[in-house]
Amino acid sequence: MEEKHLAVQAGEVGEDGIPMLTVVVDGCWAKRSYRTNYSSLSGAAAIVGFRTKKVLYMAVRNRYCMVCSRAAAVNKLPGKHCCCKNWHGSSSSMEANIIQEGFQNSVAMYGVKYAKVIGDGDSNVYKTILDSRPYDELQVEKLECQNHLFRNFCLKLKDIVRDSKAGPITLRKCLGKNILRLRKSVISATAQLTKNEVNFDCCSILQKHILNAPYHVFGDHQNCVDSVCSIQRKNDTNWIPDLLQSGLLYRIMNVVNNLADNSKSLLFSANNNCVEQFHSIVAKFIGGKRVNFCLRRSYLARCSGAVISHNSGSFMTRVHKSMYNTRPGNFVKSTERRRENYLIRRKRKMSRPRCRKNLCF
């Protein structure tokens, strides 16, 4: 197991000699919910290694079996079949159950422990892991995905802007124009702290920067550090007294406090892009979630195929060799070779220095 060897080389081994891995977790479903209708018949979740970006564990939960359902509709016993129904709870609880199962089987499957987990902010999953206590002497530590932290931060500020009861329209418009500046100020402070070795003091320093960000952006520079505050910005209009008088500043600081509490995750600078990439392959295999593959075992087969495609990059060759014990023909080889060369060129292009957006605020 490559992820295990890399952890041993990095010295991430527990007192009992078992390697401690950092993993990324997330779930996906066979049906789009649009944040309102969580009623998918099937769902899957994956545990992906942080270093290798490969799927270490994947499982599927099904709430429906076509054979059993049709037999029950006519009050008959179903015939002999391989029933795919393995879940009786809600669709939203599938993800937590699968990830809990993966943590409990980590030692038996690979001889490793998942010490740190990177998630998308779903507290239910982490609570399920803690309640199950997969490792008696070790408490799993959670790190939040940086992308989700900033996305939720901006969405909550936009909700304040749209709320007519939050404060005067002039101040809410001022907040709406400066949401991106607030985000950039946090990113800039994080980037400066991560240039050197990150330690416990960096977390407290970053928290102070984040809590001071609204004051800096809205014109109050009393507590600003010269290294992150330009002289030109110090001549801005001070909106803080008006925000404080209207009560809007308190609502802004509630959102900022939530981001400051996750300063450790921001310094770790991790995201769950690797597991999102796996989910995109699953969506490709199931027709963009527009076709119902939840009647029998089709959804499980397609998710398993997505694991092969994600881990190996040569889905057709692996499946053909496993089924027929021979390598596929030249057409399949040339197709996969072109795909591999395309990915190499794309990675080489992405590694070149690019002109990025200015992070000055």
Q: Where would I find each of the regions flagged by the language model?
A:
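Short helix/loop capping segments that flank catalytic or ligand/cofactor-binding pockets
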Residues: 32-34, 56-57, 126-128, 154-155, ...
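Glycine-rich phosphate-binding loop of actin/hexokinase-like ATP-binding domains
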Residues: 55-62, 67-69, 138-154
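Structured nucleic-acid-interacting core domains from mobile-element enzymes and related host factors
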Residues: 1-72
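Active-site beta-loop-alpha junctions of metal-dependent nucleic acid enzymes
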Residues: 60-104
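Intrinsic disorder
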Residues: 15, 19, 89-93, 97, ...
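Short, surface-exposed amphipathic charged segments that create phosphate/polyanion-binding patches used
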Residues: 39-40, 154-166
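Acidic/histidine-rich catalytic cores and adjacent linkers
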Residues: 96-143, 147-150, 164-361
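Active-site-adjacent bridging/hinge elements
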Residues: 22, 71-79, 251-255
